Regions:
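Short, conserved beta-strand element in jelly-roll/cupin
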Residues: 42-45, 56-74, 113-116
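A short, N-terminal "cap"/entry segment at the start of jelly-roll beta-barrel domains
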Residues: 1-40, 51, 121-137
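Short acidic-glycine-tyrosine-enriched beta hairpin
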Residues: 78-95
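Conserved SET/PR-domain catalytic core that frames the SAM/AdoMet-binding pocket
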Residues: 41, 45-47, 93-95
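Asparagine-centered strand-capping/turn motif at beta-strand->loop junctions
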Residues: 101-103
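A short hydrophobic beta-strand segment most commonly corresponding to one strand
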Residues: 91, 105-124
């Protein structure tokens, strides 16, 4: 983890205990901004990923992910996973079922930016199966 921390300018943060039930593996959370727009640096240990989930909103909403260190993946339901490396940006519209997490053999950190929306909420769903995750390249 120390080598990974040296790759980025954002803090790794504290163990993400508040959301641990929605992750397979250990993750860490560092709030970067909590006013106007929520921005959090999320760090995943190798093999860690979050459950499938949906960011709901009546209008607007969604999430933006910006990889800041390591290597990871983002996947929308029904589509192939997309590899993320530092500098890659993923725009996730509201109502899209998806997951994101680290590559099996590398740490991964991304900024998670909450897109403001009307009546926004998150719905956490089932874990990403080992079979699904095992298909990653």
């Amino acid at each position: 983890m120390r080598a990974h921390a040296k790759e980025m300018v954002f803090p790794i943060g504290a163990p993400n205990d508040g959301f641990a039930q929605y992750f397979s593996g250990r993750s860490f959370l560092a709030p970067i901004s909590t006013s106007q727009v929520g921005i959090f640096n999320v760090t995943f240990e190798p093999g860690c990923r979050n459950n499938w989930h949906i960011h709901h909103a009546k209008s607007g909403g969604g999430q933006i992910l910006v990889c800041v260190a390591g290597r990871g993946y983002y996947q929308e339901e029904g589509k192939d996973a997309v590899e993320m490396k530092p500098g890659d940006c993923i725009n996730i519209p509201a109502e899209v079922k998806h997951w994101h997490g680290a590559a099996p053999d590398e740490w991964f950190s991304h900024l998670a930016i909450e897109v403001p929306g009307e009546n926004g909420s998150n719905e956490w769903l089932e874990p990403v199966s080992d079979e699904e995750y095992g298909k990653l390249q």
